[in-house]
Amino acid sequence: MNVDHEVNLLVEEIHRLGSKNADGKLSVKFGVLFRDDKCANLFEALVGTLKAAKRRKIVTYPGELLLQGVHDDVDIILLQD
């Protein structure tokens, strides 16, 4: 699977699992993405896909690396569809 395809799948999953934040942008908690069964089956490396999407300015989140448990409440914000 190529990175662009995985990033597109990530955008679809953020639409499915996310909700609008105060700024009107779609947002989902990292823990929600990480624990979702469909996401677990889709993404071999969710954190790597998130980093690729962040580099492309498709999503944003604080910091560079997200870890299960520690960062479950971190918002992943969709910047573009």
Curated annotation (Swiss-Prot):
Q: Acetylation: present as a keyword of the record?
A: yes
Q: Which domain of life is it from?
A: Eukaryota
Keywords in alphabetical order, please: Acetylation
UniProt-listed GO biological process terms: regulation of actin filament-based process
Pfam families referenced in this protein's UniProt entry, alphabetically: Costars
User: Which SMART domains does this one have?
Assistant: Costars
Entry annotated with the keyword Protease: no
Q: Indicate where the modification N-acetylmethionine is found in the sequence.
A: 1
The entry sums up its family as follows: Belongs to the costars family.
Protein's recorded name: Costars family protein ABRACL
Q: Which organism is it from?
A: Homo sapiens (Human)
